[in-house]
From Swiss-Prot:
A lipid is attached at residue 394 (S-farnesyl cysteine). A zinc finger (CR-type) spans 121-205. It comes from Homo sapiens. This is DnaJ homolog subfamily A member 1. Keywords: Acetylation, Chaperone, Cytoplasm, Endoplasmic reticulum, Lipoprotein, Membrane, Metal-binding, Methylation, Microsome, Mitochondrion, Nucleus, Phosphoprotein, Prenylation, Repeat, Zinc, Zinc-finger. The gene is DNAJA1. Residues 353-365 have a biased composition (Acidic residues).
């Protein structure tokens, strides 16, 4: 039993979630609430990152489950990657802060795909916007020689203010320079490039052709190196496409295997059957259970080489795993004489010799709500004993 579930709730998972479920939840939420897409959701992005930072680490997760967020703070386990953006970059393969300083920002996009796409392979065209260096001013932001050091911050991009908080006590506050917006330089409005308005970069539409290979997985990344945002003086970043698989109506993927449930009737479970299955590449395969091969409720069987293609080895496939659910007939489906005949055909049942010490009881259908109602009524009864529900009496003279 975990002490608190706040981090799990932030990611939208249960406390017993696997690492794969945590990764999938973080991936979707981080892309949705990234500051580039939702500038007003910075706090939400921070909460998502902190939750994943703790729960993705086995030791931190154990500490959190036992003592909650307070245990993380007291246990000194809150260091992690240092910032939400570091966690994001490490997760999506963007490197760390030092790499970001040498390269332009990576652009991460989520691409929704079907299980059929991952099985057969597919090609998608993706239209997106990215920053490119302005070709009118060649990334200078204005005329040659128009760029000057910001006199407000002296080129640092940051301002430091001293705030007195008490006698002999001061607080030093560092903030982004409002004059140059943190760039450390400024351009006079009259000298700014008309195309980029002094920003040195412009937005450009880019159409990418994304090739989805057979056997790729949910969450797999496809990287277009050097196709990301450009910034003057930096190498271009990458465009990273993250595959997001939609749920399938029949099949569930487990590694290289496909899993499905199949309903069969009692007669099929006892006497055999043939069942067609439509595959993800539009073939129809037929599975057979021969008479005398009993299939019990919950039995699991498999078909070799009918699972997912193995990535980069597309001619090899996993297994198709089938769990059988046996549907039993309704009460009274046979007349007494036919039921007697059926009993003679089935294996003999074991008779119980009754003794005087035995009590006959009746077997009834289980009602899962009965215990809940009994528990509620019991609490109400105890409440009445301690707090009688008498009305307010009128005062008499």
């Amino acid at each position: 039993m975990v002490k608190e579930t706040t981090y799990y709730d932030v990611l939208g998972v249960k406390p017993n979630a696997t690492q794969e479920e945590l990764k999938k939840a973080y991936r979707k939420l981080a892309l949705k609430y990234h500051p580039d897409k939702n500038p007003n959701e910075g706090e939400k992005f921070k909460q998502i990152s902190q939750a994943y930072e703790v729960l993705s680490d086995a030791k931190k997760r154990e500490l959190y489950d036992k003592g909650g967020e307070q245990a993380i703070k007291e246990g000194g386990a809150g260091g992690g990657f240092g910032s939400p953006m570091d966690i994001f970059d490490m997760f999506f393969g963007g490197g760390g802060r030092m790499q970001r300083e040498r390269r332009g920002k990576n652009v991460v996009h989520q691409l929704s795909v079907t299980l059929e796409d991952l099985y057969n392979g597919a090609t998608r065209k993706l239209a997106l916007q990215k920053n490119v260096i302005c070709d009118k001013c060649e990334g200078r932001g204005g005329k040659k020689g128009a760029v000057e050091c910001c006199p407000n911050c002296r080129g640092t991009g940051m301002q430091i203010r001293i705030h007195q908080i008490g006698p002999g006590m001061v607080q030093q506050i560092q903030s982004v320079c409002m004059e140059c917006q943190g760039h450390g330089e400024r351009i006079s409005p009259k000298d700014r490039c008309k195309s980029c308005n002094g920003r040195k970069i412009v937005r450009e539409k880019k159409i990418l052709e994304v090739h989805i290979d057979k056997g790729m997985k949910d969450g797999q990344k496809i990287t277009f190196h050097g196709e990301g945002d450009q910034e003057p003086g930096l190498e271009p970043g990458d465009i990273i496409i993250v595959l997001d698989q939609k749920d399938h109506a029949v099949f569930t993927r487990r590694g290289e295997d496909l899993f499905m449930c199949m309903d069969i009737q009692l007669v099929e479970a006892l006497c055999g059957f043939q069942k067609p299955i439509s595959t993800l590449d539009n073939r129809t395969i037929v599975i057979t259970s021969h008479p005398g091969q009993i299939v019990k409720h919950g039995d699991i069987k498999c078909v070799l080489n009918e699972g997912m293609p193995i990535y980069r080895r597309p001619y090899e496939k996993g297994r198709l795993i089938i769990e059988f659910k046996v549907n039993f007939p309704e009460n009274g489906f046979l007349s007494p004489d036919k039921l007697s005949l059926l009993e003679k055909l089935l294996p003999e049942r074991k008779e119980v010799e009754e003794t005087d010490e035995m009590d006959q009881v009746e077997l009834v259908d289980f009602d899962p709500n009965q215990e809940r109602r009994r528990h509620y009524n019991g609490e109400a009864y105890e409440d009445d004993e301690h707090h009688p529900r008498g009305g307010v009496q009128c005062q008499t003279s």
